[in-house]
UniProtKB/Swiss-Prot annotation:
Domain of life where this protein originates: Bacteria
GO BP term, pick one: NADP biosynthetic process
Protein name: NAD kinase
Organism: Geotalea daltonii (strain DSM 22248 / JCM 15807 / FRC-32) (Geobacter daltonii)
Enzyme class: transferase
Name of the gene encoding the protein in the UniProt record: nadK
Requisite cofactors: a divalent metal cation
Length: 284
């Protein structure tokens, strides 16, 4: 590994300061840091590259921040499959499981090739209108179709592999990966899914029919959702960060992406320890 990309929350002085220290650490070892211009101007770094070009150049990506920062970088990396080392400087940190004290030892191991990655499923999401695809993206956590604040409940006709499932009458619908099962889906009473399981979760948001419950389907499933409601404000949100308006008759198709996100794992904790810590299990 020679080229190490750094992404950080530029509005967090602590993240910016650590990014500056990391650049110096890399240079002292004869490595080439890659920093997007927006961050570079905060740390007086001349080793810049356009944000969209970084995944093609980097051998490793270091993310300083929280899960939100890592999720946005995972979408950017996309098919490139560069390993991502997430350093938790945020609050919750299900994905950024490397602590600040672990960062430099973890980097040393990565440079020696002595590291393990957790491969996480990503989704390919496309929005179709009038028979044509008008948007297509990859997501790591979840896809959410929900109504605006003043809209009534919406009707979402849902198929799995071309077979009719039901028409959800609800405030919305969440389709999550196992990684995303601890996000919005969990708040809507969805199950916690181990990230190595090969499945997707369909979770209704405040369904009108009380027997509508979250359902787990195959990771190879093609989920098709059609908006049947008329004159309602409805939105498609990807990973809680990118959004599009959905109109009557639009169709949303969701399936496994071709590539996975590769997250460098912590040596000091496992998935269940992360769950216990973040969800405060066993505390009184």
């Amino acid at each position: 590994m020679k080229k190490i990309a750094i992404f950080a929350k530029v509005h967090d002085p602590r993240c910016v300061g650590i990014a500056e220290e990391l650049v110096e650490w890399l240079l002292a070892r004869g490595l080439s840091p890659l920093v997007e211009p927006h961050l570079a101007k905060h740390i007086s770094c001349s080793y810049t590259a356009k944000r969209d070009d970084i995944p093609e150049q980097a051998d490793l990506v270091v993310v300083l921040g929280g899960d939100g920062t890592l999720i946005s970088v995972a979408r950017l990396v996309g098919d490139r499959q560069v390993p991502i080392l997430g350093v938790n400087l945020g609050s919750l940190g299900f994905l950024t499981e490397i602590t600040l004290t672990e960062m430099y030892p973890a980097l040393e191991r990565c440079l020696k090739g002595d590291y393990e990655v957790s491969e996480r499923m990503m989704l390919r999401v496309s929005l179709h209108r009038g028979g044509a695809e008008i948007e297509g993206r990859q997501v790591l956590n979840d896809v959410v179709i929900n109504k605006g604040a003043l809209a009534r409940i919406i009707d979402l006709e849902t198929e799995v592999d071309g077979r009719y499932l039901t028409t959800f009458k609800a405030d919305g619908l969440i389709i999550s990966t196992p990684t995303g099962s601890t996000g919005y889906s969990l708040s809507a009473n969805g199950p916690i899914i181990h990230p190595q399981l090969d499945c997707l979760v369909i979770t209704p948001i405040c369904p009108h029919t009380l027997t509508n419950r979250p359902i787990v389907v195959s990771g190879d499933a093609l989920i098709t959702i059609s908006l049947q409601s008329v004159n309602e404000d409805v939105f498609l949100t990807l990973d809680g960060q990118v959004g599009f308006e959905v109109k009557h008759g639009d169709q949303i198709r969701i399936q496994r992406a071709e590539r996975q996100t590769r997250l460098v794992q912590s040596r000091s904790k496992d998935y269940f320890e992360v769950l216990r810590t973040k969800l405060k299990w066993g505390e009184r």
